[in-house]
Amino acid sequence: MPKNIAVVIQEDPRKTHRPVEALRIALGLSAGSHMTTVVLLGEAARLLGDETDDILDIEILEKYLPAIKQLEIQFIIQDIHNPIEVQDDFSVKRENDETIRSFIQSMDCTLVF
């Protein structure tokens, strides 16, 4: 039975490899029958940004971004005072903390990185 899954990425992709790996996992979940949404908190929004030179594992990220775009994976980005600009060709909604909290609580399963 398909599940509603949230993949929450909260770590800075400039400091650890985990955000890119989390995005790869989300891609794998999306390829199946599950409804997968990726929630990017804080600096994790850099994964979808134009300036990716300082992201760890950028080669891996660049390999998976086309598939993420093609599958139209849904992203929710934390609405902060100084938002990180993301590429236009992703399916992105900016939401406040309370909306994100409610969304995560409504999921069947949540993976946090």
What are these regions (language model features)?
Residues 41-46, 80-82:
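Short beta-alpha junction loops
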Residues 54-81:
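A glycine-rich helix N-cap at a beta->alpha junction
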Residues 75, 110-111:
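Short, well-ordered beta-strand core segments
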Residues 88-98:
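Active-site regions of enzymes building and remodeling cell-envelope glycoconjugates
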Residues 107:
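An anion/phosphate-binding loop that grips the pyrophosphate of nucleotide cofactors and donors
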